[in-house]
């Protein structure tokens, strides 16, 4: 399988560990990710001008050159999906293409890397790669953007793909009612107090389930729940100590890849206890 690969800005900044695990895992799954040359930001959280916002993603979609485009970031995925939907409008499409060197025909399909594993590869083909089934409990956290706007990949309200992946790796996906609730990352800069409130809700519920970790699919969610976890503990005078790991890191552990190659030593919340328990 081969995809045009759009890493997004975070993989070259705050999510180096995610980038490491994507490279380690997908090469072993024989899935080729051909990184788009000279890619640009998707527009991130919000760009007021609609034409500019859509054009940023359309430029990336046009660069896919006939392949489906895969991305590891929920925000990038959502923006690519929204751009595709918006470009059904012929007037907008013409305006956008006037600004692009490579015109976009509207036929590129964006996919999140979770969809690539769960649907395109499938758990049957993944199974032989799982050499060290994980004996842990894990929270499946999708975030607020992976299944929105609504698409055919998974349910926007009660998605199951990450739950099923966790189970396929030998771990137990715990029941988690906040699986699609916002982590607070998008408002961290403008309203840190509210952002920490939202993060606290997610972390406390995860702790109450008895889970060993929270599994995420988004670099912004990881940044909020890992890097800001100490701030949550300090603000609310509580102890969380909950490792936050990417789904690719979870796959890598089950495949027997070293924690260092997966970037698990780069997290702010220690993953040592999780790694030890997963390997028992």
List the model feature ranges, each with a label.
Residues 1-280:
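Iron-sulfur cluster-binding electron-transfer modules in prokaryotic oxidoreductases
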């Amino acid at each position: 399988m081969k995809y045009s690969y759009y890493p997004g800005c975070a993989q070259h900044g705050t999510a180096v560990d995610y980038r490491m695990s994507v490279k380690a895992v997908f090469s072993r799954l024989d899935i080729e990710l051909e990184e788009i040359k000279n890619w640009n930001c998707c527009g991130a959280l919000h760009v007021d001008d609609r034409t500019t916002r859509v054009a940023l993603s359309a430029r990336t979609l046009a660069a896919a050159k006939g392949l489906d485009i895969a991305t590891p970031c929920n925000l990038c995925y959502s923006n690519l999906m929204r751009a595709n939907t918006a470009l059904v409008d012929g007037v907008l499409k013409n305006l956008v293409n006037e600004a692009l060197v490579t015109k976009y025909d509207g036929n590129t399909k964006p996919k999140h890397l979770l969809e690539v594993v769960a649907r395109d590869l499938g758990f049957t083909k993944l199974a032989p790669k799982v050499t060290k089934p994980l004996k842990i409990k894990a929270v499946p956290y999708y975030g607020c953007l992976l299944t929105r706007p609504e698409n055919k990949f998974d349910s926007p309200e009660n998605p199951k793909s990450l739950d099923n992946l966790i189970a396929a790796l030998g771990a137990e996906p715990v029941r988690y009612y906040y699986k699609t609730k916002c982590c607070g990352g998008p408002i961290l800069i403008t309203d840190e107090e509210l952002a920490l409130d939202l993060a606290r809700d997610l972390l406390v519920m995860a702790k109450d389930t008895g889970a060993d970790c929270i599994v995420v699919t988004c670099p912004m969610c990881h940044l909020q729940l890992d890097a800001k976890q100490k701030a949550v503990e300090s603000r609310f005078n509580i102890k969380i100590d909950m490792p936050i790991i990417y789904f690719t890191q979870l796959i890598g552990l089950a495949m027997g890849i070293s924690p260092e190659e997966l970037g698990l030593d780069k997290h702010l919340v220690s993953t040592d206890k999780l790694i030890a328990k997963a390997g028992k």
